[in-house]
Amino acid sequence: RDRSPSRGLGDVYKRQAHEEVIALSEKLNAPVVYTFKGKMEVQYENPYEVGMTGLLGMPSGYYSMHEAEVLLMLGTDFPYSAFLPDDIKIAQIDIKPERLGRRAKVDIGLCGDVRMTIQALLRMLDPKTDDTFLLKQLKRYEGVKKDLAAYTENKGDIKKIHPEYVMSEIDKLASDDAIFTVDTGMTCVWGARYLQATGKRHMLGSFNHGSMANALPQAIGAALAYPDRQVVALCGDGGLSMTLGDLETVVQYKLPIKIIVFNNRSLGMVKLEMEVDGLPDWQTNMLNPDFAQVAEAMGMTGFNVSNPEEVLTTLLNAFELDGPVLVNIMTDPNALAMPPKIELGQMVGFAQSMYKLLINGRSQEVIDTINSNYKHIREVF
């Protein structure tokens, strides 16, 4: 049958199991799916990877798991139960026994080190020659990557710069061993989808708690711990507003952190969650200070970017300058992030939200949302 094992991975790197994961995938002809937390440790030099799964994931990752007959979960306490298949066999390997079966209906749970357990499995498994399922998922993944790349081609408009384009440029400019810190919210979405692993890069976020305003303090810690590595803080305007005092700390300790602000003038993820539930957004718009001027007042270099044509040159300048730099980029407040699988209830809720905006005299917001996300809307319908 056109089905096969699929494998979901979390924080495998800490168990130094990258080579073993590749070897197991090769032996089984199985696609590899990873979580956001595991992306930097799993994606690179991996011919079997088919993208990320979870709330911020991709359709290819989602369907690889749901179309498989067996799912092997390695080192992941996957929190998004709604994205896990419930009608296939699931095996889970984790060094912490309390995680086994906590989220998923597990048929086989093994407590142990991922690397050592895979090594033992490799000696016991016969090679699988049928690669039909793997090739099907890889083909789907190629289509997903083309769609993601297409969203970066349109740079946006004045004060409505497309965040996908910004993050793709950051990915190209950042060093191969950069440490990224991502604020919880929409910034996480763009980082998850457009920052690519190299085997040396690392990404920090509030992955377990999902708390706001984590990027800047994490960047400070990373810069102090690894003074020879490039540290890039990817902040939302909401998150940065909560940690403005940390800019003084960055200057005080002369930390060469590059702070990129995705300033959409709103609590974007909260706004999206309200819209999906059929509610017009309320109290999600932000009245922000001029973050570049705040940075200058604190003693660091600050840039404002409102024109999409100035994004690349400003980022180049920021990365080349010594010392801390803040780049405040005015991104599109209506940019949406689609989950890997859109449920009917989400579509209905979003439509209800747009209707309520219309009847409350906010028709321009509806028009702006459609104009900003026509490619996403085309995919859905």
What are the roles of these predicted feature ranges?
Residues S60-P79, V189-L267:
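Thiamine diphosphate
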Residues R1-L9, Y13:
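Single conserved hydrophobic/aromatic residue that forms the stacking wall/gate
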Residues L316-F381:
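Glycine/aspartate-rich loop-and-adjacent alpha/beta segment that forms the canonical ThDP
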Residues V50-M52, G57, L100-I108, R201-F207, ...:
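Short beta-alpha connecting loops at secondary-structure transitions
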Residues G38-K139, F319:
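Glycine-rich, acidic loop regions that bind phosphate or pyrophosphate groups
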Residues A30-F36, A91-D94, I259-F262:
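Short internal beta-strands
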Residues V21, E142-P217, A222:
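Active-site diphosphate/adenylate-binding microenvironment
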Residues E67-A68, T117, R123, P127, ...:
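Conserved thiamine diphosphate
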